[in-house]
Amino acid sequence: MSQTPDKNTPVTASDDAQNIAADVDEVMRKYDRESNTRIWSGRQAVVIKVFMAAFALLCICMTLFSTAMPEIRLPGFMGFIVLAGFLNFPASKHHVKPNYLPWYDILLMVIGAGCFFYFAFNAMTMIKLATRIQPIHVVIGVVGILVLVELCRRCVGLPILVVAGLLIVYAFYNQLSYNTSFYQALKNIIYKLFYTTSGVIGTPISVCYTYIVLFIIFGAFLERTGIANFFISFANRLTGWSSGGPAKVAVISSALCGMVSGSSVGNTVTTGSFTIPMMKKTGYKPEFAGAVEAAASTGGQIMPPIMGAAAFLMAEYIGIPYAKVAVKAILPAILYFTGIFISVHLEAKKLGLRGIPRDQLPKWRLLLRDCYLILPLILLVWLVSSGAKTMSHSAAYSILAAIVVGLVNFFLTRMRSAEEKSAKTTVRAIGGALADSGKSAVDSLEAGAKGAITVAVACAMAGIIAGCITVTGLASILINAIVQLAGNATFIGLILTMICCIILGMGVPTTANYCIMASTCAPILIKMGYPLVAAHFFVFYFGIVADITPPVALAAYAGSAIAKSNPMKTGINATKLAIAAFIVPFIFAYNPQMLFENVTSVFQVVQIVITALLGIFAVAAGLEGYILRKMGWPLRVLAVIGGLTLLIPGTVSDLIGLVIVAGIIALQLLQNKRERSEV
């Protein structure tokens, strides 16, 4: 374990960050399956790059201009996903031989894609046949699903496969229990899962094809404009000077970057390679440093407006505009990051940590100079929120804006590095910027296509899970079981649903995670009488926090790998830091006004915001054991109780919580005054 440095050592752009840069790829390969891709070089790399870029362009064109029916568009899309998937993801992370595509991968790629293309080209026939599909169609469906399962194992992981596998087995059991022959049971299940919009080509993959892929491509373009470095520099300038500044930098930068990246593990590694070494050098323990980055990166998935692309799925499932989903997510996200921010501040005060010297921080002048980098994101938010364009067209316009911003950035970078300014230098800079921009555009399209593979496969598997639940009526069984267990104690029902969400969400990507929660857990809460929007936000939050909840806390383990800390301790610390995510969903389940539902007055919203922020502050202080000075266990417990009381809806509970928290602060002020007078 790394030795904790002197807490009074000034923090600079840490040398540790350079020392661990070589380990980043290794950590990504270990904890993020999206990074376990084949190695291509030379001509093969060019061919693959062109294919992936062309696939991304095809996705954009199909989304914007195709009017074909879903049974044609979606199987065709999945056919290309299978081709791209086996080209990029080897059978094992140990198969890293450059330019090597084994015969069995070629076979799987061709057969699997062929199954989906067959469906696409014969869609009208399959629709007319309906449940009268022939044995050859059953074989094609079985092979297509098996190939999809193998691709899922490679690029998504085992947890979602285990859930899907158990549900498919249960679906067979359910069919056979009606004295159906094995073939008839297989035929019924394959028809439902492969040939209808209740399975592989169901709502999840439809939303993925229509919206999510474009936003993934937009995110890839945005990242290559240098916006991640801008976010980190902005966070550094804003909070780096304060006590424990690097941890606050991690919170802000990870929230902004994670919102765009859509991967808690990937964001933990990329921003963590910079922030975690700085936190350690400031004086934070390695377990705490890794936990801060993991908790903040996971929070990026609930950060509006993009919310790791899950907002688009939520809008589809709930049946409200995307812009309203983003607005409803604002207050819970503020509470989440406020809780983390307060925790790292109090930890820094408790340890007496310093920040970064102001003369080593980025200059406001330089940040203002580069603020044009966020214009594509601003354009996207404006187009979507104003309703001026559809979400697909908004993403397309934002991609074009990102290309223009990237071109400007390349040009300005070349001009700034030029020794002399002249017309000739300007012409060269323009030519170089055009070349750089073209290369960056191809790289962005390739990266976007790669990112789309994992999300599309996960959404397809989520469609299978939803289809199995529909075929078997399992949702009703699960709902009735939890309702009976909970009885009239609705809080027990929330606890049981929370446990289900965390278990089902372990190791599952954000988009597929929400699809599973919306199909299995949200109906439970709706049946118990909770509002539709609150139910979906509740299950979404607890599905996401599985990434930092031991034992399968992938984001926390990725953070611990960079921090060189104990993984389990890092996971526990991350859970403590993200305590708001475990409390707030219960609050908006009982008080939907926190999601701006059924709000009757501005005063009501103001009261909710102020008391919720004070409540999160008190809970975080109780967990950290510090407000103005260290607290003993009795005061810590009292602070948590006061915070929870503030979070409970109602004026009386708010007043009780205020009295408790004010009493603790007054007591600490008196203790500090007494100590000063004694000195």
Region locations from a protein language model:
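Long, contiguous bundles of hydrophobic transmembrane helices that form the permeation core
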Residues: S2, D6-V46, V327-G451, L554-L644, ...
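Membrane-interfacial loop-to-helix junctions in multi-pass transporters
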Residues: P135-V139, S198-Y211, R237-V251, T282-F288, ...
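Transmembrane alpha-helix interface/packing and boundary motifs in multi-pass membrane proteins
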Residues: G219-E223, S254-S263, A295-Q301, A462-A466, ...
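Conserved, well-structured core domains of diverse proteins
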Residues: M1-T131, V138-V142
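Core transmembrane alpha-helical segments of multi-pass membrane transporters/permeases
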Residues: E150, R154-C155, V163-T180, L186, ...
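Membrane-water interface regions at transmembrane-helix termini and the short interhelical loops
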Residues: M62-T67, N88-N99, T125-M126, G144-L158, ...
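Hydrophobic transmembrane alpha-helices that form the pore/transport pathway of multi-pass ion
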Residues: I232-G300, I306-L313, G319, T510-F542, ...
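Hydrophobic mid-bilayer segments of alpha-helices in multi-pass membrane transport proteins
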Residues: K49-A53, I72-L87, Y104-A113, V138-V147, ...
